[in-house]
Amino acid sequence: MSHPAIIALTPGEPAGIGPDLTVMAAQQARDYPLVALCDPQLLKDRAKLLGLPLTVSTYIQGSAVTTSAQHISVMPIPLGAPCEAGTLDSTNAAYVIETLKQATEGCLSGEFAAVVTGPVQKSVINEAGINFSGHTEYFADNSNTPRVVMMLATEGLRVALATTHLPLKDVSAAITTASLTETLNILLADLQLKFGLSQPRVLVCGLNPHAGEGGHLGMEEIDTIIPVLEQFRARGHNLVGPLPADTLFNPKYLSDADAVLAMYHDQGLPVLKYKGFGNAVNITLGLPFIRTSVDHGTALDLAGTGKANIGSLQVALGYAQNLAMQQASINEIAG
């Protein structure tokens, strides 16, 4: 590429810690161009509240993007109403959606190489009459992507999910031959294309205790999971399992694994967040562009206090940059 790929950053809920983290991220010089999609006055006000210096420049497509310390480029998107740190206002729900819309369009057009998302308050968006179930679903719907996979990563561990935000009683029915096949196809493809792993080794959790104990503790492994894994192994993929989730997460298995596929949200993510909370990143696999996100919420009580932890945003930005560079290399090789 002739110039460094631009990373788009949506700070998320304006009353939360997303603007704080954006201001904090701008304090250090960067080796990649970063553009915040938000109201520039919001960042100026939050910087003043935090007592941090900040110069804001208007982003103009095709022009150089600042990478200097204490300086950030902003694609201006106006708030619906003035924002007070820590106080939700549904008037600003449409503003949050507009930042995501602009990020999606920029990524699809190639203007941005990746988008990093700050935390949003789903409840206040829905209270404003906007049907919104989350970033992942929004990006999938607005890029015509029929299925995506949620993966969280921290140092030494990547965990993808076969199902995401479902009640536990609905998980078994959601794990079908078709859905598990689609999940594995997306996971393996993105580990190869976006992470540069030519032959990824993936550990697959069973659904039931002891991975079903040969059918005595549930039949999902025998009826669905094992047959799907056998089909992938027959095509040369390096999949191990199904393994009992209570023993899979130890060095004996993880030392040479590239990722773990958990069957449901609270099977895999508690381990990952115990290992790396505050320094983990959420990556959406299967999209036609790169999207990473922080692993925490809006933390309204911390907004404007200077007590927010920037660790997860730093990791999310780092992942976005590395994945963008990997994608650029692949594109150059492909011609």
UniProtKB/Swiss-Prot annotation:
Keywords: Cobalt, Cytoplasm, Magnesium, Metal-binding, NAD, NADP, Oxidoreductase, Pyridoxine biosynthesis, Zinc
Protein name: 4-hydroxythreonine-4-phosphate dehydrogenase
Note on cofactor: Binds 1 divalent metal cation per subunit. Can use ions such as Zn(2+), Mg(2+) or Co(2+).
Positions of a divalent metal cation binding: H165, H210, H265
Pathway info: Cofactor biosynthesis; pyridoxine 5'-phosphate biosynthesis; pyridoxine 5'-phosphate from D-erythrose 4-phosphate: step 4/5
Known role: Catalyzes the NAD(P)-dependent oxidation of 4-(phosphooxy)-L-threonine (HTP) into 2-amino-3-oxo-4-(phosphooxy)butyric acid which spontaneously decarboxylates to form 3-amino-2-oxopropyl phosphate (AHAP).
Location(s), subcellular: Cytoplasm
Principal location: cytoplasm
Assembly behavior: Homodimer.
Gene this protein is translated from: pdxA
GO biological process, one term: pyridoxine biosynthetic process
Record-listed E.C. numbers: 1.1.1.262
Cofactor(s) for this UniProt protein: Zn(2+); Mg(2+); Co(2+)
Chain sites annotated for binding substrate: H135, T136, K273, N282, R291
